[in-house]
Regions:
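Short, acidic, metal-binding catalytic loop of nucleotide-sugar glycosyltransferases
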Residues: 24-33
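A conserved acidic beta->alpha catalytic loop
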Residues: 32, 40-49, 66
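Acidic helix N-cap motif at the loop->helix transition within catalytic regions
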Residues: 45-53, 94, 98
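Glycine-rich, basic loop-to-helix element that forms the pyrophosphate-binding segment
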Residues: 47, 64-81
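Conserved donor NDP-sugar-binding/catalytic core segment of glycosyltransferases
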Residues: 98-138
Length: 300
């Protein structure tokens, strides 16, 4: 398959205004070597008219016959892409104009890499720069330097378990090297994090560039915000780390197992959310979050 071409598979359910901005950021790419597929999972806002309005033959539209759910739509996106490189471009995010060239260059420098990622600029609903404490923590945890970042083996997974510093929406996948099964429908939030750990458990390599190439949007109606408010996000992170601990124990990755058992970054995030709930006088959330932060267990 052509390694100088990338497919942007765009799973879509709702948020037509954000989708329009996402597609415009595609049109604005400095490197024109891309294709795009919008996969409409039968949400409330049909996207066909918006997609066709761009009048660009590189952008195609598929409306699923039934709602496939998050994992199902993501796996379909991977399966119908015709190129070796595929980015699951979230429909409420935007690309910096350099993303295509940046990621193609990265993946072609590392021919054996299963996936590649870049740095992110976090934006708000209107596209302005957004500051948040969890994002600042990621900046502290992530590897430093100006060279490409190579993540592999026990050491690589240990760094991700200590703090999930890769912004998974930026990941571009090399289809031919992906683990079998794709994204697991067992998850609603940690699908891509789970896939990165399976890549590393299987001996694969993930590479990254310290250059910013993506704009990740935080807003009140996106999946992350909704699952954070319902605590499903934290329960999944705890369950995921329990799974990583079990798998690490089986193959003798003791340092990963110990870190997964401690769940430090998740517990700190729970305590941070508990403090926010106290400030907001959101009494129904305070105790579950506090107990989760202290004991590393949470029931949604």
């Amino acid at each position: 398959m052509d390694e100088n071409l990338i497919t942007y598979a765009i799973p879509y359910y709702s948020g037509i205004g954000y989708l329009r901005m996402a597609l415009q950021s595609l049109i604005d790419q400095e490197n024109p070597n891309w294709l795009a597929i919008v996969l409409d999972d039968r949400g409330g806002e049909d996207a066909e008219e918006t997609v066709l309005s761009f009048k660009d033959d590189r952008i195609s539209y598929v409306r699923n016959e039934t709602n496939l759910g998050l994992a199902g739509n993501w796996n379909k996106a991977l399966s119908i892409a015709k190129t070796e490189f595929v980015t699951l471009f979230h429909s409420d995010d935007e690309l910096e104009s350099n993303y295509t060239g940046l990621i193609l260059g990265l993946m072609n420098r590392h021919k054996g890499a299963v996936a590649g990622h870049c740095r992110t600029r976090v934006i708000d609903a209107s596209g302005g720069n957004l500051w948040s404490l969890p994002d600042e923590v990621k900046k502290i945890i992530r590897p430093k330097g100006n060279d490409d970042i190579v993540t592999q083996g026990e050491e690589g997974l240990l760094s991700l378990v200590k703090g999930a510093w890769i912004f998974c929406p930026t990941l571009c996948y090399r289809k031919s090297l992906l683990p079998s099964g794709g994204f697991s429908n067992a998850w609603k939030f940690v699908l891509d994090v789970d896939l990165t750990s399976r890549i590393l458990f299987d001996g694969g390599v993930i590479v990254g560039t310290p250059t910013v190439g993506y704009r990740y949007r935080r807003h009140s109606t996106n999946q992350t915000a909704l699952l954070t408010q319902s605590n499903i996000r934290f329960q999944e992170e705890i369950d995921y780390l329990n799974h990583v601990s079990m798998r690490s124990s089986e193959i003798g990755w003791k340092r990963v197992q110990r870190s997964a058992d401690r769940k430090v970054i998740v517990r700190l995030h729970l305590l941070y959310q508990a403090l926010r709930a106290i400030v907001e006088l959101n009494w129904s959330r305070i105790w579950p979050l506090l107990l989760g932060g202290i004991f590393g267990r949470l029931k949604s």
